Every structure is written in C-alpha cells, then in structure tokens.
C-alpha cells in the first residue's frame, strides 16, 4: 500500500455528507495520509475547521472562491485572517479567477441562483488580498482559474506570493505558460477527470510539468472520472452528475504513473515529498 495525498477536494460538500463514514473507512483502507479540504466561502470555514478536528487526515484550507466573491461580508478578510491564525496548519483556498462564471454560464443555471456574480476586476481584488495574506503567513494557496490564465499570470507576478509556493489546482492552462508559472512557485494537481478523451491536450501538459511540482487531486464530490475508471461509484448527485468519491485519488495516481512512464511507487514518493513541501 502506497501513501496517498489528495491536494484538493471538498469533503464538506452536501453530496458526500451521507457517505462520510463509508468514505473515511475507504480512505484509511487505501492509505490516504492527507487531503486538503477547501472551503469556498465564509459560511464553510467553521465547517471545514470542525471536520479537520474530527478526521485526522484532513488538512483544512479556507478562502473565498471567485464564484462567492460577490457575496462576501464587509469583514471577510479579517475573518479569514482569524481563521488562519487559529490553525497554523490551515492553507488558503479555494481562491482564484473565473471568467466563465461572468461570461459563459447560462443565466438560469441553478448553481448561481440567488448569488451575485462578481466581475473579473472584483474577483481579482478578492484574489490578490487572499494571496497577499497567504504570503504574509506563508501558507500554501490553492488556486482556481478558468479562462483567465493571462490575467492570473499577471496578478501572480505583481502580488506577494507564499514562499512555500501555491497550487494551480486541476491545471488547465496553456502548455507554454507552465515555465512562467513554475518560476513563480507553482505546483500543479492532476485530476482523474482528465481520463476523458476531450482532455487529451491537458494530459500532455502533465508529461511536461517538472516532477518536483506534481500533485494529485480528486476535487470530490465534483469531477468524477469516466464510468470505466470510477473505482468507488456513489450514484448521481442532485444535478444528476456522478458523485466523485475521494477514494478515486488512487485512480489519479495510476493514471499519472502510466502517463509519465514511472512506477506507482516512484510516483508516490515524489508526490509525498511535493505535498509535504508545499502544505506542511
């Protein structure tokens, strides 16, 4: 059994709640050592903090996601600082930029019902404030970026960054930007959803990323692998998409080892070193 590390997931999200006991047992049986569980708004911070006290494999991470940037409170940044100071293990995230939520999502999509969508400029303000806080406290930052890679690179260049580095979770940016992001301190997490044929170009990126910057993630309960790769089916969620069991992290390890032409054991040693260097 190899040690497993999940660099980005959401164990606190509702679709996983009825399955927590089973998931916990499955993860312990698989050999999961740590998983970074990312809160996405102020209401979730105490929930993730409480779960981290209950489950010893959870590494808590707190932030305001770009989808939630338009709904933050007046004292959100002070609250985030307090949350991070209360737990020296805690990372910053999920934070970032998302142009699709501004320009691409359908107005009646239930995921945005009742929330205010922040324009990209406002998202950038919220992101840079959190990145600067991560730099001040030297906490890892877990970054979400959709259709805004040029803007993200520009912000990372001009904003203080944590000395330990930051994670571009589920990296989907251009291959030609990898060198620039790496020079700024980036790590990159491989997601099991990349097994889908439509993601072939993103798979190639993970051949080129330096070995000492590789991590793996599930993003559970979202981004389930294709059915033929889904080792732990949990059925459909409220939106009829498959619920992704965090145990599918082993599938990500197997896929990435094959993609890079290394043994599972060699990959696990490298990923463990990378995870501990970034997060702990």
Where are these regions (language model features)?
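An N-terminally biased module of ancient metal coordination in phosphate/nucleic-acid-related enzymes
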Residues: 1-59, 70-71, 75-80, 85-163, ...
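Residue-level detector of alpha-helix boundaries and kinks
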Residues: 33, 115, 137, 166, ...
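Short hydrophobic/aromatic-enriched beta-strand-loop microsegments
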Residues: 56-63, 164-167, 187-192
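H/E-rich (His + Asp/Glu) clusters that bind or coordinate divalent metals
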Residues: 10-13, 17, 91, 96-100, ...
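Helix-turn-helix-type domain boundary/helix-start signal
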Residues: 69-70, 265
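Histidine- and acidic-residue-rich, metal-dependent catalytic cores
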Residues: 66
């Amino acid at each position: 059994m190899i040690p497993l590390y999940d660099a980005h997931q959401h164990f606190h999200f509702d679709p996983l709640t009825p399955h927590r006991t089973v998931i916990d047992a499955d993860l312990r049986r698989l050999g999961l050592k740590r998983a970074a569980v990312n809160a996405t708004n102020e209401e979730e911070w105490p929930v993730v903090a409480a779960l981290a006290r209950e489950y010893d494999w959870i590494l808590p991470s707190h932030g305001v996601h770009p989808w939630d940037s338009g709904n933050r409170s007046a004292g959100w940044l002070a609250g985030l600082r307090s949350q991070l100071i209360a737990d020296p293990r805690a990372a910053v995230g999920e934070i970032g930029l998302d142009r699709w939520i501004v320009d691409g999502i359908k107005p009646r999509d239930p995921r945005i019902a009742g929330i205010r969508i922040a324009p990209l400029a406002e998202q950038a303000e919220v992101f840079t404030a959190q990145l600067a806080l991560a730099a001040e406290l030297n906490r890892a930052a877990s970054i979400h970026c959709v259709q805004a890679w040029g803007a993200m690179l520009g912000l990372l260049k001009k904003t203080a960054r944590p000395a330990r580095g930051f994670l571009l979770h589920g990296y989907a940016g251009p291959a030609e930007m990898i060198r620039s992001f790496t020079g700024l301190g980036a790590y990159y997490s491989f997601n099991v959803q990349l097994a889908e044929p439509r993601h072939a170009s993103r798979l190639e990126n993970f051949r080129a990323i330096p070995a000492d910057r590789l991590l793996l993630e599930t993003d559970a309960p979202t981004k389930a692998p294709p059915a033929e790769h889904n080792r732990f089916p949990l059925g459909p969620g409220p939106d009829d998409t498959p619920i992704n069991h965090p145990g599918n992290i082993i599938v990500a390890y197997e896929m990435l080892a094959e993609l890079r032409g290394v043994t599972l054991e060699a990959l696990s040693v490298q990923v463990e070193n990378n995870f501990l260097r970034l997060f702990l």
